[in-house]
């Protein structure tokens, strides 16, 4: 009866997240202090006080979400919980993979925060504002969504990029690329029978080929930090397999910038490898909700508040 810990991605941020963890657990507060020191600014003040529009900027949201996830984990550990002894696998959605890797000892908390700040800035700068877009497609088979993307790319100027960026499961796919191509693909998906095709309010076309400049920046950034083999298997977004090779993990993180987040397959992999319980560690309950739709046999829980820390400790022993 294995347990998996998962770490949320962008979109789960909210002003005030993690504050009660920091108030209840000195070890959790220390995580926020470590990240403030690493970034040379009071990110914790922004997390707890806002404004929301500044917190939502990708260069802030990415390290902020990791801070809350690692604070929740440190709170568990402060009460005697052992990640290595109690958890079989970890994974994270997009930026959450960095949280999972920091939790597993692949990189230090400080380096992970700096990597995510670099990643957020690089992804934001890769495409001029207004030229990229993303859309959520609900209730359409993946093959039909991919066909719509291919048709839209061919029908747009200069063979514009359009691709599936996130396979979230539960009938939800996210497409990403050039604005004109994504808008056309969303229209085509509706014509093919999608229940909804919703343009997303995002600042850049994440997880698309247009992020190639950001991928190169991350290749250099990852080469410049100390890396260790994780103490617990981390299931990769890009390959849906764990590896203990630090260089291979770094390669997969570079590929992740332009590649698909294969979250549905990740949850399916958990089920196939004996996971009976999945916890979402950090802000929100997006991943636990997705997991319930993907595999109803996996029980879910969340660890993002002081009360949830206590509940998880009682359940996990």
Stretches found by the model and what they are:
Residues 23, 151-153, 190-192, 288, ...:
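Short, solvent-exposed amphipathic alpha-helical segments in soluble enzyme
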Residues 258-275:
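A short, acidic, amphipathic alpha-helical segment used as a generic capping/interface helix at domain edges
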Residues 94, 226, 274:
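Conserved functional loop/turn residues at catalytic and ligand-binding sites
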Residues 181-183, 221, 274, 306-307, ...:
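NAD(P)-dependent dehydrogenase/reductase Rossmann-like domain
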Residues 1-146, 200, 277-311:
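FabD-like malonyl-/acyl-CoA
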Residues 10-13, 39, 84, 104-259:
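Alpha/beta catalytic cores of group-transfer enzymes, especially the acyltransferase/condensing modules
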Residues 77, 190, 271-274:
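Non-catalytic positions within long, well-ordered alpha-helices that form the structural scaffold/packing
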């Amino acid at each position: 009866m294995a347990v998996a810990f998962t770490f949320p991605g962008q979109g789960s941020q909210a002003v005030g997240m993690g504050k009660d963890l920091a108030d209840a657990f000195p070890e959790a507060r220390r995580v926020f202090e470590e990240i403030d020191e690493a970034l040379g600014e009071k990110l914790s003040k922004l997390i707890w006080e806002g404004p929301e529009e500044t917190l939502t900027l990708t260069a802030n949201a990415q390290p902020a979400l990791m801070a809350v996830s690692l604070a929740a984990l440190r709170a568990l550990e402060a009460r005697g919980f052992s990640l290595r002894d109690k958890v079989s696998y970890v994974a994270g959605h997009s930026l959450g993979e960095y949280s999972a890797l920091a939790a597993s000892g692949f990189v230090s908390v400080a380096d992970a925060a700096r990597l995510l700040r670099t990643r957020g800035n690089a992804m934001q700068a890769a495409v001029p504002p207004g030229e990229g877009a993303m859309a959520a497609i609900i209730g359409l088979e993946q093959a039909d969504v991919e066909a719509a993307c291919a048709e839209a790319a061919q029908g747009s100027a200069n063979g514009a990029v359009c691709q599936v960026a996130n396979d979230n499961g539960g009938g939800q796919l996210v497409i990403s690329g050039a604005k004109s191509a994504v808008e056309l693909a969303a229209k085509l998906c509706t014509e093919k029978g999608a229940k909804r095709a919703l343009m997303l309010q995002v600042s850049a076309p994440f997880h698309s080929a247009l992020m190639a400049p950001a991928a190169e920046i991350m290749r250099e950034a990852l080469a410049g930090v100390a890396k260790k083999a994780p103490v617990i298997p981390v299931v990769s977004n890009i390959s849906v397999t764990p590896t203990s090779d630090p260089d291979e993990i770094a390669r997969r993180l570079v590929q992740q910038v332009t590649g698909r987040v294969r979250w549905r397959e990740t949850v399916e992999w958990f089920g196939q490898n004996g996971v009976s319980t999945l916890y979402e560690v950090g802000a929100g309950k997006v991943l636990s909700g997705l997991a319930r739709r993907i595999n109803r046999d996996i029980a879910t829980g969340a660890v993002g508040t002081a009360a949830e820390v206590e509940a998880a400790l009682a359940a996990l022993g």
